[in-house]
Amino acid sequence: MQYGYFDLKNKEYVIDRPDTPAPWVNYLGSPEYGAMISNNAAGYSFVKSGANGRISRFRFNSMMALPGRYIYLRDNETKDYWSATWQPVGKPLDSYKSVCRHGTAYTVISADYAGISSEVTYYVPIGATYEVWRAVITNNSDKPRNLSTFGFVEFTNDNNYEQDQVNLQYTLFITRTSFEGNKILQHINENDGKDATGSNHRERFFGMVGAPISGYNGNLDSFIGPYRTYSNPIAVEQGKCTGEMNYNSNACGALQSDITLQPGESKELIFVLGQKDNAQANEILASYEAAGKVDNEVEALKEYWHSKLNHFQVSTPSDAFNNMINVWNAYQCFITFIWSRAASFGSGTRRRKDPLYAVCTGRQRRRSAAGQVRPQRRS
C-alpha cells in the first residue's frame, strides 16, 4: 500500500492518502520553540523543552494521535461540518480529498470537500518563538457559501508535561482563560513570580487575524461537549461558540469566524499560537495584517534550510539514496540535535560523539541545548 512519495525538487514528502498506518510526523521550529505535526495536524508545541515547556496537549499512544492544530469548517445552510485536515472529523475518503506536504520545518495540508477547498500552512518563523497556521479557504462551487470556521488548540494546564497529565489536584486549580480582542489568553499561576511589567512569563495566547471573530471558547468541556470527542464538538455541530471561559478546569483556545464566499472567492485566515503576554501577543498579531508576510516567512524558511542542507551532498546512481542522505537524514539530525533529542520527555542528555558526527557536515555552529532536568513532583 502506497501512501505518499518524495518530491525531490521541492524537498518535500507528499502524503496523498491521509489514512496512514500511523501518524507521519514532521518537525517545526527552532531551539527556542518547537512543534511536532502529523499528516492530520495532530501534535504538540513547546517552549525550549518538550518536558518542561509544553504549551499544547498531545496524548501519546492513544487511538491514533490526538489532539492537535485543528480548523473546523461548517456549512451553515446544510449544517454539515468537517475539518481542514482529514482528522479529527474523518469524513469518508470517497468524498473527502486531502494531501499533506511535509517540508523542511513547514507542513502544508490541503483538503477538498463539498465544493470547498482549504490549504493550511503550519510553520514557525525564523527567529520567532510562536507558530503560525495560515488557512486559505476557497469556494469552488457555483453558488455563494455561508461558512463558519473554528480554529482550535487544547492548552496544557502546566508547562510540565507530567504534571499536566497526572497531577490534577494541582494543575486544574492554577489556570484560567480570558478573551481579549482577537485572541484567547491563558493565565497559569498568575500570582506567582511576576516581574515589573506584571507578567510571570507563563501566559499563552491563541489569536486570529483575517476576519472578525464571532464566537470563542476558553473552556475545553464547553467547546467539545459532554460525551463527545474532537470529531464532533458541540460548538461546531451547533454552529456557535458559547463564550465560556475556563477557571479551575481544562483550558482551550477556540475562535469562530463567520464568512460568506462567492463562487471562486477565497478567504485567508491566520492563526497564531505562542507563550506571550497580552501586549506581546497584540504586537505579533498586528504584524500579520501586512499582506504577503506569511509567504515571505515561508520562503525565508525554505531558503534557510535548503542552503544548510546543501553544505554536504552525495551523488550515487540511486536518486532515493541521494534524497535520503542529502535531505531527510540531514534534516532529522539537525532538528534532533538542537532539541537535545528530547522533544517528548527526558533529561536531554546523550552520548557526545553521535550528535556531533551527525551535524558536523552541515557546519552546524551551535552548542546542544542544556540538559533538561527531570521534573520533581509537586504537592
Question: Where are these predicted regions, by residue range?
Answer:
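Anionic coordination/interaction segments
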Residues: 1-364, 373-379
